[in-house]
Amino acid sequence: MEFKIVNTICPYCGVGCGLGLVVKDGRVIGIHPNKRHPINEGKLCAKGNYCYQFIHSKDRLTKPLIKKESGFVETTWNKALEVIAENLKTYKDEIGFFSSARCTNEDNYILQKFARVALKTNNIDHCARLUHSATVTGMSACFGSGAMTNSIEDIELADCILIIGSNTFEQHPLIARRIMRAKDKGAKIIVIDPRRTITAKNSDIYLQIIPGTNVALINAMINVIIKENLIDKEFIKNRTEGFEKLKEIIKKYTPEYASKICGVDKELIIESAKIYGNAERASIIYCMGVTQFTHGVDAVKALCNLAMITGNIGKEGTGVNPLRGQNNVQGACDMGALPNVFPGYQKVEDGYKLFEEYWKTDLNPNSGLTIPEMIDESGKNIKFLYIMGENPIVSDPDVKHVEKALKSLDFLVVQDIFLTETAKLADVVLPAACWAEKDGTFTNTERRVQLIRKAVNPPGEALEDWIIIKKLAEKLGYGDKFNYNKVEDIFNEIRKVTPQYRGITYKRLKIDGIHWPCLDENHSGTKILHKDKFLTDNGRGKIFPVEYREVAELPDKDYPFILTTGRIIFHYHTGTMTRRCKNLVEEINEPFIEINPDDAKSLKIENGDLVKVISRRGEITAKARITEDIKKGVVFMPFHFVEANPNVLTNTALDELCKIPELKVCAVKIERI
């Protein structure tokens, strides 16, 4: 009887908790705490504790599938790859790729390289487009980098923690532990959220904002801080530019003015601003409740402005800290799984010559299409789509639009571990290994690169993602460009072409991981960014004054409620993995909609009633959950349940700067069934 513990990293959110997979007779049978891990110190959330339960699911894909008139039939790898290769040759100029935040750095690197080297296209994107593209665009403009500025451990050192648009206690529970430690030491916690979440219930001040009014509220806090002279004059003078213009624009954003927009008492705005402004070390934490709007970039810039004018950047216990929602969404961005940048955020238009030298081939010098653009162009300028580890028919806005787009393709390939809702539409389905069945690296929300380790073999004929892409490259005659014998070979190439990873090696990652940038093998990594200068062209932080703008779809007499969406503690994204975990399903396995008691009374809806939720794009059915935790006029639904997927209802309106959809707000009506 073989029995072993394999230390690896959790496959869910972006915290990057360490855990041990308990293996017996070639199967993972449980989780062993990794008490030495610097992030979670042996603790795990519910999802982490039961993450092993989907590994050996009977639903796992085990053989390649080709769709015939009668449905899917099993085939050989050789046949499947030949069919894909022939279609790639046919549609060479009309191809798009979706990469994946669930896959390793190595998997993402090799797919974006395959797209660019073998197909000469920059039409590659992944789900960061739907979550933190606003962060990358906004923070890069202000700071020169779109990543979390401080480490997770560092949060404990803050005197004030401003949490906006993040239910940290449910979605990043091990970061919430750090927040509570800071609170125990005297830190003040400010929470801004339309829902009175468990995070809000643990705050010192709670501002129950109307969804989509973040910019007005943040600007009002800045107004108070300037008026009360709580700014850091030396930091502004020596480290930033643009403050005078901000002062002018911010004058109209008085607490009284913002209160009418945000639905928050002006005294709470004033008190929050004073607490943040008076703190010696103030940290900002945010998530999708800031980014998933048509003005998401503006909200990110506003938060950066708030941090810069108070000098809360570049030192312990401070910073602007966007929490990543997926295990490797940071890494997928780092690897260049984006249409406008190569690995290391080197812009396509500026960096293509350099990568032509690296990869010894001609490259396309023009930026490619984003996910929303590829969806819109499906059946027109995009005829072939290759999707690795993404489920857009559940996760993307306006599901009917996505389904119609995917069905209009001439050829669709899906590479995944389960036959997802998206995979069911594919012409060819390729069975992939899950995270427990491969070696590689993930990069977590704080830029910490960590090793994941293979614990068991993939089921049946399933293969690691990078091996599948390598085999496909060989079919197209590009085997010499993908001559890797093991996954570490790919990482060594990543180091050469990605400046932030240059000093990181597998050997150095064996203990605690390393925060990028790590410039050489003697460098210990960088826990705090922007200590002495920003990563902008002149080293100064750029203050960008931003104005409040309304959301794309406001409630009206026909659709009087604002629907906002999100996650719950027991499930993850489209539910593909967590809804195959017995213990998590036992906690909750049915969709619901949260409704304020006053709204429920006016609609004659009682707790547990089935209701229809209807938008201009579709309708779904769910059980009513009556709660004072949701603001009047606002309703909330999680998007884990495909049988009542709120993305049937959501709007495809985009932030024009980063192309993120406005997933956090759409107008709906509710009818009792």
Swiss-Prot record:
Q: Does the keyword Calcium apply?
A: no
**EC numbers:** 1.17.98.3
**Annotated GO biological process:** formate metabolic process; respiratory electron transport chain
Explain how, and how many, cofactor molecules are bound: Binds 1 [4Fe-4S] cluster. Binds 1 molybdenum-bis(molybdopterin guanine dinucleotide) (Mo-bis-MGD) cofactor per subunit.
* Domain 4Fe-4S Mo/W bis-MGD-type: from-to ranges: 3-59
Name the cofactor(s) required for activity, per the record: [4Fe-4S] cluster; Mo-bis(molybdopterin guanine dinucleotide); Zn(2+)
Q: Which GO terms describe its molecular function?
A: 4 iron, 4 sulfur cluster binding; formate dehydrogenase (coenzyme F420) activity; formate dehydrogenase (NAD+) activity; metal ion binding; molybdopterin cofactor binding
Instruction: Enumerate the residues binding [4Fe-4S] cluster.
Output: C10, C13, C17, C45
Summarize the subunit comment.
Answer: Dimer of an alpha (FdhA) and a beta (FdhB) subunit.
What does this gene product do? Answer: Catalyzes the oxidation of formate to carbon dioxide, with coenzyme F420 as the electron acceptor.
Q: Which PANTHER family match?
A: FORMATE DEHYDROGENASE H (PTHR43105:SF14), RESPIRATORY NITRATE REDUCTASE (PTHR43105)
Family, similarity comment: Belongs to the prokaryotic molybdopterin-containing oxidoreductase family.
Protein's UniProt name: F420-dependent formate dehydrogenase subunit alpha
Please name the taxonomic classification of the source. Answer: Archaea, Methanobacteriati, Methanobacteriota, Methanomada group, Methanococci
Gene name tied to this protein? fdhA
